[in-house]
Amino acid sequence: MSVAPTATYRVRAASQATRGAWRRSDAVLRTAIIVLGVIVIVTVIAVLTGLTGSTSATVGGRLDGPSAIAPIGTDNLGRSLLPRLFQGTATTLVVSIVAVVCSAVVSTLLGMLAGYYGGAANEVVMRVADVLYAFPALVLAILVSALLGPGRPAAIISIVVITIPLMTRVVRIATRAVAERDFIISARISGVRTPVIFARRLLPNISGTIAVQASYALSVAILVEGGLSFLGFGVQVPEASLGLLIQQGMLYMTQAPQLVVIPGVVLVISILCINIIGDGLRDRFEPRETRSLR
């Protein structure tokens, strides 16, 4: 006689546990959005107010600690670290965002073509993607940067090259799943032009998948940009990026650890927040069928 109440209790307990997990997940997601938003907003304000333009001004002694003039200390030339931190964060974000936007556009186009048409188009696109995907990401980025020379353009192109393969594969899978649905098949039979099908029927149904992959690509882009600049293949002096600040601070790690720790913390927190936001986007927008196919 106690079987039914026990089963009901277990169902309710499982339901409450699920709701509790969702609340915790939402709280983590909101925290990540707020933290990343603060980083972006403060950086934008610093750029707009010209604070990043004072990076060459000497305000104190070499490798000084925090003070009223230099809130997070000075570097090896006596310059305040705070304006350079803002400049480095802005450079890293701009390079990464531009690269991911370019990669998302190219990957979406290639993935939709391969998934929609199949056949030769699919073979060509996927084989090229497989070749690029076979290389370790940072090694491929270094090769591209070495060929093009260091600087922002080389960093952007390197990130585009390493993020296109995976995004293209995922978009192709999502496109194939949507292209087999009745409303796409009926549109093709009715003679609707392919560009119209792509723009009005395919793209809206895979936009969630694209957003998820773009968010993950952004975290990869920030990490790779930092790695390239740290190794001397990315942004060059007198500009600054988070990776370059870490590389310059390594020489004075024992005397002024904040030169490495603070840019490193900003880099790690940014990547962590973007990954959490990507997980939230995946849970809300990406279909389960696409995840299982992958």
Give names to the regions the model predicted:
Residues 133, 144-147, 159, 174-175, ...:
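Glycine-rich helix-loop "coupling/hinge" segments at transmembrane-helix boundaries
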Residues 1-37, 276-294:
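Transmembrane alpha-helical segments of polytopic membrane transport and secretion proteins
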Residues 162, 208, 212-216, 257-294:
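C-terminal transmembrane helix and the adjacent membrane-cytosol boundary/short C-terminal tail
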Residues 71, 75, 115-116, 121-177, ...:
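Generic hydrophobic transmembrane alpha-helix motif, especially the helices
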Residues 46-49, 95-130, 142:
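Transmembrane-helix boundary motif in ABC transporter permease subunits
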